[in-house]
Amino acid sequence: MGKNVKTLIWGFGAMGSGMASILLEKGGYELVSVIDTHPQKAGKDVGELLGRAPLGVKVTMDHLKAFGSHPDVALIATSSFVEEVSPQIEFALENDANVITIAEEMSYPWIDSKEIAERLDALALNRGKTVLGTGINPGFVLDTLVVSLSGVCKEVRHIHAKRVNDLAPFGPTVMRTQGVGTTPEKFEEGIRSGNIVGHIGFRQSIMLIAKALGWTIEDIVEERQPIITNVRRKTNYVDVTPGNVAGCRHTARAYSCGREVIFLEHPQQVCPEAEGVRTGDYVVIDGDPPVNLRIEPEIPGGTGTMAMAVNMIPLVVNAPPGLLTMIDLPVPRSISNGF
């Protein structure tokens, strides 16, 4: 084994702090810097914030100071959107760090932010570094996993993938973006205004699958519908009464050569078991041979995202430079001791 990989974490919320804990549990890594804009975290020891012994690494709001530790890789967990994370990615690249971000739109940024994607790719190539967007979804369940399963097929005609999860552990921000707790009328208003977005990443997952399978996508049609509860559903953050919205049923259909080739579903709601709905991840490939995969319950989104980001570090550090996707890299795997 070579020297430890010096790692910086940008964004020390639930995901960033979870990544830090995973890094500290594995060998082969050295957590050298943490950046966060929350004033109550700034200046505090990372170990103490994690409920551990002091590490001698303090959270800072000073980006330049943080990168003075010369990290090999920066894990960015600050936003879902390309426009918001691209300045952070550029700063990391300019300071000679590889980048792994869990921003959903960065899993395939060319589809909605082509100019930014091309700029990031050019900068990464110029600096000899690698940039990757990943996570549980997009990044795995509705794209990388699907692509891997297609490898046993002589032919693929249609793909149907679905993720059913429980939003109960999530906080107010997620509840608002999914419309949880609103009336059906307010849900429709939120869809029109853009305040209720449903799942972020369908378009990116579709393009990852299409690129891997050599399909040309002509159109993507998305639909968002409210999931109305018939029973009371209560979490630590929201109390949903019968007749109101417990979540968002978001779907996306992709067309090639005039026919549907990909159908993705992601109904997200609080306490689905309250009405007999089982959580799970499902992939059905109409191919030769056909493939039907069921994972129940669903792969936990939080843990899965944190683990995927950390587990991709060795693959990214050893990858060719540029802005890459999950289908450009070897199969993800859990590496117990760094490299």
UniProtKB/Swiss-Prot annotation:
Q: What are the protein's GO molecular function terms?
A: 2,4-diaminopentanoate dehydrogenase activity; 4-hydroxy-tetrahydrodipicolinate reductase
Q: Which reaction does it catalyse?
A: (2R,4S)-2,4-diaminopentanoate + NAD(+) + H2O = (2R)-2-amino-4-oxopentanoate + NH4(+) + NADH + H(+)
Q: Which GO terms describe its biological process?
A: lysine biosynthetic process via diaminopimelate; ornithine metabolic process
Q: How is its activity regulated?
A: Allosterically activated by (2R,4S)-DAP. Negatively regulated by AKP, and by both acetyl-CoA and D-alanine.
Its top-level enzyme class, in one word, is oxidoreductase
Key word NAD present: yes
This protein's UniProt keywords: Allosteric enzyme, NAD, NADP, Oxidoreductase
Task: Report whether Coiled coil shows up as a keyword of the record.
Answer: no
EC no. given is 1.4.1.26
Q: Subunit composition?
A: Homodimer.
Protein family according to the UniProt entry: Belongs to the DapB family.
* Physiological role: Involved in the ornithine fermentation pathway. Catalyzes the oxidative deamination of (2R,4S)-2,4-diaminopentanoate ((2R,4S)-DAP) to yield 2-amino-4-ketopentanoate (AKP). Although Ord is more efficient with (2R,4S)-DAP, the diastereoisomer (2R,4R)-DAP can also be metabolized. Ord is specific for NAD as hydrogen acceptor.
Q: What is this protein called?
A: 2,4-diaminopentanoate dehydrogenase
Organism of origin: Unknown prokaryotic organism
List the gene name: ord
